[in-house]
């Protein structure tokens, strides 16, 4: 299993106009390949501190894509950084299965 990130991680990446946020729901192997299960938020943030505040009050985040599956190659092409880890909820686990 890939050890870069783990389920429950909040990952951010930079866009032209600020930062966007993803949540890693699960990481699994599919026939030897790594598959990443993510949710995406519609919120954009001007800086990292704003992301940290939003994660602290997770109810303020708006999920735009509840579940997307990426191959390892597609995931690696997006440069993300981990900012926090919060256990995946039972509702989030249901989305993946």
Language-model features: locations:
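Loop/turn positions that initiate beta-strands
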Residues: 6-10
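Basic/aromatic-rich interaction segments and small domains that mediate binding to polyanionic partners
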Residues: 27-52
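Short beta-strand-centered aromatic/proline hotspots
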Residues: 18-28
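Short, surface-exposed secondary-structure edge patches
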Residues: 1-4
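Intrinsically disordered, low-complexity, charged/polar segments
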Residues: 44-97
